[in-house]
Amino acid sequence: MQKFLYRSYVALGDSLTEGLGDTGFTKNRLNKGWADRLAGILAAEAKQFGEPFEYANLAVRGQTFAEILTSQLEDALRIKPDLVTIMAGANDIMSSRRAHGSIRALLRGAISRLHEEGIQVLVVNTINPAHYPVFALMAKKSREMSDLIEGVAHEFEAPVLDLYSLDHFGRMSFWYDDLVHFSNHGHTMIANLAAEKLKLSFRLPEKPYKEIAEPKWGVFETLRWLILHVVPFWGRRVRRVSSGDLIDPKHFDLALFEASSDAYSTFVLPGTRAKTPKAVAKK
């Protein structure tokens, strides 16, 4: 009998992997974000094989490559899951090129150590900040960071989920109202793309691309964005504090996930109607 390859999964990353921007995250961050959604897909897949599935999300908002690939990596190696995803670099995009050497070495070391333990690694590159003109200044640095990540991953023949090349993120509807985190549409799409990259059978239902309405964005929305998001961001930079200070990972150790009828979404097999409910973590 064929054995399911991914009976346990650990997600490493920053706020993008923690799930910020997903619907309802500010009230309850559990079962939110692309990684939690991918864990749900994996849980449904495992159920088809009659296997249990466990998941941990070690991502913490504001963390850099160095932080993710030191403390988070050590915890992942302690847990020893079947699968690890690494989405890092968003908080390093504006770093100088001189820092790229150390980032490259960290990523090489991380993938090497994970592979030595027999852990499958899926690497995610950085986004192309093309959705809002003010971010155009970051486009070149984002491309350079993505090239760095892809280059190291290819050295180890590790699969890469290419977010940078996706046209979807040129649309405001795939971003939360802070313009730096994914919306629920973005998180769902990434989870499905990761499932495709891992050659899984299940997918989450997505609204057709052309049917997703663009949010209204004018002077009022711009002022609101500046007051609620930009000013606090620069305030933290001036005080040299991180949004992740005093924040713990939401799933510090492996927790059992299983397909459940009271799940918050449903799975859908490619080419079929939804039939298997999404996974939820057991407490």
Name these PLM-found stretches.
Residues A90-G101, N128-E144, P232, R273-T276:
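Serine-dependent acyl-ester chemistry module
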Residues H131-Y164, N184:
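Substrate-gating cap/lid alpha-helix
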Residues V10, A39-E45, F49-I79, V84, ...:
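Internal alpha/beta domain cores that form substrate/cofactor-binding pockets in large enzymes
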